[in-house]
Amino acid sequence: MANMRKNHPLLKIINHSFIDLPAPSNISSWWNFGSLLGMCLVLQIATGLFLAMHYTADTTTAFSSVTHICRDVNYGWVIRYLHANGASMFFACLFLHVGRGLYYGSYMYLETWNIGVILLFTTMATAFMGYVLPWGQMSFWGATVITNLLSAIPYVGTDLVEWIWGGFSVDKATLTRFFAFHFILPFIITALVIVHLLFLHETGSSNPLGIDSDADKIPFHPYYTIKDILGVVVLLAVLSGLVLFSPDLLGDPDNYMPANPLNTPPHIKPEWYFLFAYAILRSIPNKLGGVVALAMSILILLFVPFLHTSKQRSMTFRPISQCLFWILVADLITLTWIGGQPVEHPFILIGQVASVLYFAIIIILMPLAGWLENYLMKW
């Protein structure tokens, strides 16, 4: 059996990736989120496939088809809420995974990091299109507001928006194409995940100390497979609790009203995992400036490896950088809160201060902290 595992053309790849893979002996539970994200992706594709069997991508029947899934399909409500709350768990794991990468200097593996940022972008696009599909009030107005942002692009903006809409407003054509993209993108994400793992296994995992771990490696199985199973059990327990006890906790009540182009909801807001970017968008009075800031809130991650000035890779022994990192986390939580608030005083000012601080920490303060720590260590 061992021979087959090591020699069979297909099993050999799985063996080198998940069984005999040499892994650092000291990686903590923060390294669990990669496997949890893989599990979330499989769960989303599986539940999404069953939902697609009963869903109709038509403006007149989309809302009714989702209601039909919840009421008439066997365990349809479980599948629907697993999919909706599974997306929330997916993004929670994504943000923790990116945060781990920032804290422990995983961004120094350039190719892996860049593919990861592309994955984050693609996942956000997929989730946005999925939010439009139930065709509730927030689905319709969210799609209208966010796609309309592209009209801020000089010269081609208006044409681009109408091209995406497939007409002069968000309508049947928009819903149909969003469903098509929402269905195909998870498979593109799966392909990108394979590339992400390919680049990761070229270098091997980093570790909490940020030092070379070639001298002390252990096999991935059984040590980290058991550790990953614990993470999966915890994640499934939290997800089950959400789905079975408060499935609408993270949703918006407005989405239980069918889309009405003649009635604008008092507060248009996306799902919680987009609120930080939405707050940055709203904090800039100029439309084009807001769109640029929105894009940069994620794209800035691509510049992080080039802004690394410290001679140590990880933040484990860098107290000043640690303080800045946790201020950044608090700032992102503040932005998430602001994104869900109405556009009025004092929320506008808090959002603007938090947005400036977000970019200042990453672009200015982190590199300065790295230099200062080098100086204090007499390097």
Curated annotation (Swiss-Prot):
Question: Would you tell me the Gene Ontology cellular component terms?
Answer: mitochondrial inner membrane; respiratory chain complex III
Q: Where is this gene product found? A: Mitochondrion inner membrane
Q: Which GO molecular function annotations are given, in alphabetical order?
A: metal ion binding; ubiquinol-cytochrome-c reductase activity
Q: Which residues cross the membrane?
A: 33-53, 77-98, 113-133, 178-198, 226-246, 288-308, 320-340, 347-367
Specify which residues bind heme b b562 according to the UniProt entry for this protein: H83, H182
Give the top-rank taxon of the lineage listed in the UniProt record for this protein: Eukaryota
Under InterPro entries, the record lists: Cyt_b/b6_C (IPR005798), Cyt_b/b6_C_sf (IPR036150), Cyt_b/b6_N (IPR005797), Cytb/b6-like_sf (IPR027387), Cytochrome_b (IPR030689), Cytochrome_b_C_euk/bac (IPR048260), Cytochrome_b_N_euk/bac (IPR048259), Di-haem_cyt_TM (IPR016174)
Instruction: Look up and give the membrane topology term.
Output: Multi-pass membrane protein
User: Subunit structure, briefly?
Assistant: The cytochrome bc1 complex contains 11 subunits: 3 respiratory subunits (MT-CYB, CYC1 and UQCRFS1), 2 core proteins (UQCRC1 and UQCRC2) and 6 low-molecular weight proteins (UQCRH/QCR6, UQCRB/QCR7, UQCRQ/QCR8, UQCR10/QCR9, UQCR11/QCR10 and a cleavage product of UQCRFS1). This cytochrome bc1 complex then forms a dimer.
* Protein name (record): Cytochrome b
Name its species.
Answer: Tupaia belangeri (Common tree shrew)
